[in-house]
Amino acid sequence: MKSHKTRLTILFSFLCILFCILIGRVVFLTFWNEREVVLKTGDRIMRGAIYDRRGIELAMTVDSATIGIYPANIYDPNFTAVQLAPYLDMPPEKIEAIIREKSRYFLLKREIDESLGNKIMELSLPGVRREKEYKRVYPHGNLASSLVGFTGMDDDRALSGLEVQYNQELMTPTESDSSRGSNLHLTIDGLIQYKLEKALGKRFEETGSKKAIGILMDINTGKILASASFPAFDPNQYNESGEDSHTNWAIRHVYEPGSTMKIFLASVLFNENLIRPDEKFHCPGYVELGKTKIKCTNAHGHLNLEEILQYSCNVGIIKASQRIPEALLYDYMKKFQFGEKTGFLPNESAGYFPPLKKWTPATSMFMAIGQGISVTPIQLVASAASVANGGRMLTPRVVSHFSDSYGAILHEFKTQETPIGIREYTTEKILKAMTRVVQSGTGKNAYIQEYSIAGKTGTGQKAISGKGYVEGLWSASFLGFFPAERPKIVGLILFDEPKGGTHSGGGLAAPVFKEVVENIIPIIEQGERTLNVSLKHFQRKNLKGTNVGEIPNLIGKSKREALEILRPSGIPIKFHGSGFCYKQEPDPGKKTEDGRLNLYFK
């Protein structure tokens, strides 16, 4: 009898345990997994946005939905698949097969539009869950993509460009907003960037070039206004393009600068008074350096140094460069920072500049025509700027400042410079010669009648390891300053291995430089006033009922709302107090006199 009771007790206990397990399983499937979705996203930080100098969003984070499936809770996989298919852009057969194949919870499709996620939830399908995720979006596609970079599907996992370099700042919450990272503001001007990419990309396609690179930099601050690299890619679909497209060739491409190097040799000659102003050098059309015969495009006859630059005379610059002692030339080239990284971005190439102990009697002669030395595009632009800005070697920079979600500046980047002792006389001589290059020399295809450009063409054969210089492989470039009388901008256009009959810097790169300058003159000339100008390419948001330059009514708005409304206009804002806006200067509908808007909150 006792044994019978014991067996009943054991059986009853077993049934109770089994019942509790079943109840627990139901509770888990019904509630716990849903809670897991919330916990998974509850502590996520929204990645900060990346803006150009106008406030145009180059990278932003938006809410998205990810659809998850609990196969054990789905009683009719076919019905569920048919219901989901139209929203997920997937064949129902494929969805059904995946559901039947899986046994544990899985993600069916990630980062779909949030509105689609809401519609799927309205279907009330058993076993279908929605997870909230953040999605990184690049609203203007490939605009500045090689510079900005991209993130993976998880937006906290940066993969390239500025997204990687400033990943920590973009993902670290600020004191004013614990849910969002800092915003990154660039020196890039989206309108100038667009014009550069449009002109450069068109010629890149037409010539079938291996690469095309364009840079525009403020000559007095080192701020990069535009930087383009082709082949390009859309960071929204980065998996559809190769690594060559993802690379920022403005800092990675290493090449021999060719005749653009002549301005640096001429700068040394002028700066050290190593030749007389009226001194001339004879060019019979070639010069022999040992067993090597270097040709000129023509037998130029007798030329002074300015004319040597004007006609890009190889023989003339080689003969003139022999006046420079090797140690002095070496010191100047190091001041120009050849063979060194500029400090612009971390993965920058250094180029190559031979140590003095490896120099031969011919080293300086080949260097005069841009051979035996290699540079990056950003390096050449920075070095050239120092010739035209009075000897200030600037560190190029593309980041202006960080801000919080209310627009308050958290950290501002300053101009870094090193004086290298270029005299005003030297600058005047070089700019005068380079202006003549464009007016009547090898760079005449960059000439604009109403606007002066100073420039230097570069055409060089490419060398391949073990084979030397190869016929048919060329590098074509144009280095320019504008306006020539008092330069504000230095720029470089470069084509690597162009195909077809035109491969010279004057024939290929100079016309592109001209097109870019013509298109951006209104932007450069009007300065800050153009921050209210936008292209159709950028018209994502509009201020309804607000004329360009007029201030909208912001009374009653929060700081975030005011910032969002004013962002497309690029108007600088100064916040006073906290809470909601009760006063603004200037008043709604009026224009700012000093370009700044003061908002008062309480």
Cite the ranges covered by each PLM segment:
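Periplasmic/cell-envelope proteins involved in peptidoglycan metabolism and beta-lactam response
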Residues: M1-Y238, W249, V254, P325-Q337, ...
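Beta-lactam-recognizing serine transpeptidase/beta-lactamase-like catalytic domain environment
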Residues: E57-A59, G214, D218-S259, F264-F495, ...
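Amphipathic alpha-helical surface "interface" segments used
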Residues: E101-F106, Y138-G141, G351-L356, E450-T457, ...
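Short, solvent-exposed alpha-helical surface patches in non-cytosolic proteins
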Residues: A144-V148, K223, I263-F264, V381-A382, ...
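Extracytoplasmic Gram-positive cell-surface binding/anchoring modules and repeats
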Residues: V254, H537-Y582, D587-K602
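Short, gly/Ser/Thr-rich active-site loops of penicillin-recognizing serine hydrolases
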Residues: I409-T415, G507-I551
